């Protein structure tokens, strides 16, 4: 009986120690919306934010990525290509594409390695005859560390207002390589 009690206490202590050593991730949800009016038709702006986006997308897993590319079709990838050998990252997968109207992709983007689902939607709305209201909606659910929602929103502010908007207004998206 004493042996069984000792084994039971030992097992209980080990399970308590193991439980204390394990840090359970925090699960949460967050979302936000951004918008900016850009010069160009919805189709022109759609084309500028798909295909090769290396001219304005600047957050990467690689120190010197070769290319960022969004394939604007269902099942297409949002790729970061590291080098000529094809090493890289699939940041997300396109789940809805309608040129000049909507692009939606599902994937963790910079949160790769976490148990998180991030759905990002681009919407394109004509403003007058030569401008587009570009709307970005981000919805996320899953493993979310403290401060991550604010960081992700800040990064999107950077992409939209510090990178994409000046890129479009400079006309660089119209220069074909």
PLM features per residue range, with description:
Residues 53-89, 176:
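Short beta-edge strand/loop motif at the mouth of beta-sheet-based domains
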Residues 16-65:
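Hydrophobic ligand-binding cavity/cleft-lining segments
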Residues 34-36, 68, 90-96, 118-126:
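Hydrophobic/aromatic beta-strand elements that line small-molecule binding cavities or substrate pockets
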């Amino acid at each position: 009986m004493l042996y069984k009690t000792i084994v039971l206490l030992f097992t209980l202590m080990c399970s308590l120690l193991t439980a204390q050593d394990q840090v359970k991730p925090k699960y949460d949800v967050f979302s936000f919306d951004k918008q900016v009016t850009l010069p160009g038709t919805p189709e022109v702006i759609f084309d500028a934010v798909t295909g090769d986006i290396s001219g304005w997308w600047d957050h990467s897993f690689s120190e010197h990525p070769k290319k960022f590319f969004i394939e604007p079709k269902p099942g297409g990838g949002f790729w970061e290509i590291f080098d000529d050998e094809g090493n890289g990252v699939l940041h997300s997968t396109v789940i809805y594409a309608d040129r000049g109207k909507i692009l939606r992709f599902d994937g963790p983007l910079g949160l790769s390695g976490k148990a998180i689902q991030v759905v990002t939607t681009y919407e394109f709305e004509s403003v007058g005859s030569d401008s587009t209201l570009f709307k970005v909606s981000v919805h996320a659910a899953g493993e979310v560390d403290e401060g991550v929602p604010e960081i992700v929103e800040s990064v999107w502010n950077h992409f939209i207002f510090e990178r994409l908007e000046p890129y479009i207004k400079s006309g660089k998206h119209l220069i074909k390589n």
